[in-house]
Regions:
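Conserved C-terminal structural/oligomerization subdomain of aldehyde/semialdehyde dehydrogenase
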Residues: 12-14, 21-147
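Short intrinsically disordered, low-complexity coil segments enriched in acidic
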Residues: 1-4, 134
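Short secondary-structure junctions
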Residues: 3-12
């Protein structure tokens, strides 16, 4: 309806017709405004949007309301580093996808969530921290003196 072209998949597997299952699907999008390129799909769907420059690719990736995860694939390690730092996503995979560790924090940005699950960051977010300073000196010192 919006001009996207299904390159493969896009249908239910016959043997799984009783559920909400779809074959892995690749959609070629004429621009970044196709819904499948702008919403968070929790299914095997890849929306492909063509770009000419690195800057345009970053702009396309960041031009949506979501930012759970992203992936950058390139033989140029410096480009991978540069682009991954520019993407507005809670997780960025470089030359891999879905490497997950329970020790690492997990979470998105924008409408994909606030805060982190797993790892130290998740524990830290649940704590109420307080700083307490104690002086063992019997002499009352100037409270406005920086030590």
């Amino acid at each position: 309806k919006q001009g996207g072209k299904v390159l493969c998949g896009g249908e239910r597997p016959k043997e799984l017709s009783d559920g909400c299952y779809f074959l892995p699907t690749v959609i070629e999008c004429p621009d970044r405004n196709v819904d499948t390129a702008k919403i968070e799909l929790f299914g095997p769907v890849l929306s492909v949007v063509k770009f000419k420059t690195e800057e345009e690719a970053i702009q396309i990736a960041n031009d949506n309301d979501y930012g759970l995860s992203s992936g950058v694939f390139s033989e140029d390690v410096e480009r991978c580093d540069r682009v991954s730092r520019s993407l507005e996503a809670g997780i960025c995979f470089k030359n891999c996808y879905r490497f997950i560790s329970y020790a690492a924090s997990f979470g998105g940005r924008k409408q994909s969530g606030y805060g982190r699950e797993s790892g130290y960051d998740a524990i830290s977010a649940m704590q109420i921290k307080k700083t307490i300073w104690t002086s063992n000196s019997r002499v009352t010192e100037d409270p406005f003196k920086i030590r």
